[in-house]
Amino acid sequence: MNEDNSQNSEGPSRKSFFERLSQLFQGEPKDRQELVDVIRDSEVNDLIDHDTRDMLEGVMEIAEMRVRDIMIPRSQMVTIDRTHNLDALVAIMTDAQHSRYPVISEDKDHVEGILLAKDLLKYLGSNCAPFNIQEVIRPAVVVPESKRVDRLLKEFREERYHMAIVVDEFGGVSGLVTIEDILEEIVGDIEDEFDDEEQKDIRQLSKHTFSVKALTTIEDFNHTFGTKFSDEEVDTVGGLVMTAFGHLPARGEVVDIAGYNFKVTAADSRRVVALQVTVPDLEALSHVAEE
């Protein structure tokens, strides 16, 4: 009897969940929120793990996003001028460490094509053929800012290309987007072989200023600077700063928190990336430069 009662006591909640789960497969949910609820219930009931839930929600989110929401803005693009010689190209690629570069002409709004770093290999070393950039430029794919991200992902997969130039309604270049940008919306940040895992989260720039990664934990920040910022509501310095702003700040915006000046030095359409912090008193921070 007790066993039966136990099973019956679980009945309503389990029935409710399975009814919603079965609705997912037997017919379309009534709205987006209903689908989100089913996915989250699946995690609660251990049918999927947290990472899977995040990916499923990421897939849903890109269906509502436009290319302008995830593109790398024009001001942050690393481009190559068609007049550059081989030595100049190698220097740019060594510094930027990207695999693909837009090639531009004197008119910055005219992208002649895409140059792949690997296409320069045959020109390096002794007894190589004379370099002509026109021989290695590949056609550029151009997409409007308003294009849906999920449709662009489908085109990336079907056409087997990895980068597109983004243009505004007047045909001017406004940025670029890669397949990695889209995938990161689904699975989170993707680190490649060039990401510096050992780069310090906090680096001293001058006597009073420090470079701080937005993902630095508040605990580490407090330990370094002797501050007492709370980590009950946010875990990172980026979260602390965004809370103080009350919005997603752009590069160059500044806010003061408890006497500390935070300037956004890098940000994109989704997050704060890096900050410059000016501290009020360095007497107690002489150990930072040594760490």
Curated annotation (Swiss-Prot):
Family per record: Belongs to the UPF0053 family.
Protein purpose: Plays a role in the transport of magnesium and cobalt ions.
UniProt-listed NCBIfam families: PRK15094.1
Entry keyword Endoplasmic reticulum: no
Protein name: Magnesium and cobalt efflux protein CorC
Taxon lineage: Bacteria, Pseudomonadati, Pseudomonadota, Gammaproteobacteria, Vibrionales
GO molecular function, one term: flavin adenine dinucleotide binding
Domain CBS: 71-131, 136-193
GO CC terms, sorted: plasma membrane
Key words, A-Z: CBS domain, Cobalt, Magnesium, Repeat, Transport
Pfam families: CBS, CorC_HlyC, NMB0537_N
PROSITE patterns: CBS (PS51371)
